[in-house]
């Protein structure tokens, strides 16, 4: 049954790819690249009237990511370095350092529910951006509430705490065949806990509990700032320019 579903999804993906090509959409104006210093980025932006789990999965397999109610894909001049990376949930085996990270965070309590912007989370988000210098993001309340928390019905928020202290929080999209990590931020004072690694480990466990076969971690960019941790989760697949996962 799963093989037939995969074949049907691939045919639908190809039809969608042909449709997008036929529209000849214009990318956005150039802006500083958030991943590679000294380069410019351009994005192909779409705002579907209705974004459903099935349609979004097809778009992810065409190298699109979601932000708010829209989806985007890099369309940079002379650069094709941004490729989706995903993990095979059942095949994944944690490394020694990842097992150590899990033990180090055994006191962390996670809650999973609808996205809920609060002042406490916004403070952590703003401090995270200040510590990480995350591209062109400003840390404003409007940015935090609109782009992260204004989301389709299949979006969820995972919040991590130790006792009452907020460790970090992330937005994820949950579909029958895939979970996608949209954005994660954490208290920079707790960076020694490796919250980003722990978040991925927790999401992998949540995928197993739900029977979801794939976890999408967003774009991998060779040499990109803050990207190396993604390839430490193995085995992983990277979406090639030809649309094939390898």
Segment roles from a protein language model:
Residues 207:
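Hydrophobic pocket-lining residues that define ligand/cofactor binding sites across diverse proteins
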Residues 59, 125, 200-203, 230:
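Residue-level preference for non-acidic, small/hydrophobic
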Residues 67-78, 84-192, 232:
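A conserved beta-strand-loop-helix scaffold within acyl/acetyltransferase catalytic domains
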Residues 192-204:
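Conserved acetyl-CoA-binding loop-helix of GNAT-fold acetyltransferases
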Residues 2-65, 69-91, 162, 169-188:
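Conserved donor-binding loop and adjoining core beta-sheet/short helix segment
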Residues 74, 83-90, 214-246:
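Active-site/acyl-donor-binding loops of N-acyltransferases
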